[in-house]
Amino acid sequence: MEFKLHSKYKPTGDQPQAIEQLVKGFKEGNQFETLLGVTGSGKTFTMANVIAALNKPTLIISHNKTLAGQLYGEMKEFFPENAVEYFVSYYDYYQPEAYVPQSDTYIAKDSSVNDEIDKLRLSATAALTERKDVIVVASVSCIYGLGSPDEWTGMSISLRPGQERDRDDLARALIDLQYTRNDMDFHRGTFRVHGDVLDIFPANADDTAIRVEFFGDEIDRIVEVDVLTGEVKCSLEHTMIFPASHYVVSQEKINEACLNIEKELDERVKYFKGEDKLIEAQRIAERTNFDIEMMRETGFCSGIENYTRHLNFAKPGEPPMTLIDFFPDDFLIIVDESHITIPQIGGMYAGDRSRKTTLVDYGFRLPSALDNRPLNFEEFEGKIDQMLFVSATPNKYENEHELLRAEQIIRPTGLLDPEISVRPVEGQIDDLVSEVNKETANHHKVLITTLTKRMAEDLTNYMAELGIRVKYLHSDIDTLERAEIIRDLRLDVFDVLVGINLLREGLDIPEITLVAILDADKEGFLRSETSLIQTIGRAARNSEGHVIMYADKITDSMRVAIDETKRRRKVQEEYNEAHGITPQTIQKSVRDLIAISKKVAADENALDKDPESMSKKELEKHIADIEKKMKKAAAELNFEAAAEYRDKLIMLKNTLRDIR
């Protein structure tokens, strides 16, 4: 099936030529290309058009869950007839296994798995197995080890009416796929049996179960049923049941792998005893033998991913299997915000190895556990077929590898890159206060970026004393509160937002008319050309947007950022003049910005009820309501809201236990 792009808009401005250039280059065999798109130029729409034109499976990698969620939502709207999937870390909370030798402290792995994301991850690999028209939006967790695609696909169960297969045989096969039988509580990853009928709730399904009806030792009929109502939706001529976990292996292979694990264990115990490390020898023997026994008995154990090398029969040091291995050979990778995402991919391997090496050295894990890891950067490069970098500020890696660069400088709204002025550091605060007063008198908003937390706090306090409505956005503020602060700025609760490194990607506030950059001439990460261009972009959503840099000299980074902004502005002005376009400030509803926080705020009263004053019955009902809201928030990918509900749920359940 081909990709079918649905949109009420047609490509405009620079989009048509950018799409044409990129598609032509990839069809001619280019491996690396770059889309340089300024803030607000419609890069996501261009990406969608490129995917539709190339018509090949696509992996979009984003540098965080929130942005991945936004892209996932947009791509689902663009491609409603195709498989758009979401693959990020399924942990709401994750404390990795670790050991601190200095204090002899072992920290066991502790995690809370988000059931909804687990389903979406399984759905992504199922879609890649069954069809070609697949877009997977992922975070960098896509480079972490996953089970073998061949094993996962090979163990899947194919069912057809007329197939010779008895009910008990199918039940045993489902257990091998890590499904559990539960005739009372039917949920994702379970099956139930009633006479000659076996119902399966696929691990990658939402609200649809598969009902298999038998006549003797033959499948008589297969239907889809609504889990809630039991209503038959449709009959099926064929269905595939995929494993309930990515770490699924046949019992035969598990038994063989256990023999290899025992060999490695013997070698490790001998090594520790030879080094007179008797505690480590005893520790590794006890822990590993327990895991081996669990795998032989149940086909699974806690931390089974640490034995991935043995379960996949891979050689020491071989690259792990990842989500990328589920894609066919001919596929496209799009790296969103590549100037951040590429370095992030490069940094994953070293941090993971450092922690695991300590566990191995002190007898908590076998050396083979080091192969349960993310890809290193060279291995990641080895899996690239074709790659599109997307960024407003491509970095060194993109510059060195791209064979083609398409620029998207024209905004559909006609908005120009802001004008920039450079002013001396001496007297910068008084000058800034004067500029802030001018902007706020016209009901405009201001962003100020400083270099240090101390300066941000002092500036915020000073302005507040002068009667300016100001708030400070710092790194200790969580995602929900951050969204609320931005909402308050847009709703005119205050006028000036001060921050350090939080004013760059993803902070698009159309009401901003002034961005002030203090100490712009202090070379470093926060004042690099990339950071400066991204910060300048925050003023590009308003037709009156402008930027003031406070500096005593023009650094190389400042010069590049200023020259690039001037170049873009000139191109934009010429285009607007030629086409009779008047720049229009972006109109964006405040509700769009705070969807996450509203999930919690919508029922603030319910959350704030005093559980101590409730009867047992009221408390049980309240718990059920909160649990429902938590699952709904998770289903809508509002994970911060879901976490808030989860914390409330724990508290309420503790209160209920005390009442009992």
From Swiss-Prot:
Residues 24-177 form the Helicase ATP-binding domain. A motif (Beta-hairpin) lies at residues 90-113. It comes from the Bacteria. Gene3D superfamilies: 6.10.140.240, P-loop containing nucleotide triphosphate hydrolases, UVR domain. Residues 428-594 form the Helicase C-terminal domain. GO terms for biological process: nucleotide-excision repair; SOS response. Residues 620-655 form the UVR domain. It is found in: Cytoplasm. ATP binds at residues 37-44. One of its GO terms (molecular function) is ATP binding. GO terms for cellular component: cytoplasm; excinuclease repair complex. InterPro entries: Helicase/UvrB_N, Helicase_ATP-bd, Helicase_C-like, P-loop_NTPase, UVR_dom, UVR_dom_sf, UvrB, UvrB_inter. PANTHER family: UVRABC SYSTEM PROTEIN B. The beta-hairpin motif is involved in DNA binding. The UvrABC repair system catalyzes the recognition and processing of DNA lesions. A damage recognition complex composed of 2 UvrA and 2 UvrB subunits scans DNA for abnormalities. Upon binding of the UvrA(2)B(2) complex to a putative damaged site, the DNA wraps around one UvrB monomer. DNA wrap is dependent on ATP binding by UvrB and probably causes local melting of the DNA helix, facilitating insertion of UvrB beta-hairpin between the DNA strands. Then UvrB probes one DNA strand for the presence of a lesion. Belongs to the UvrB family. This is UvrABC system protein B. The gene is uvrB.
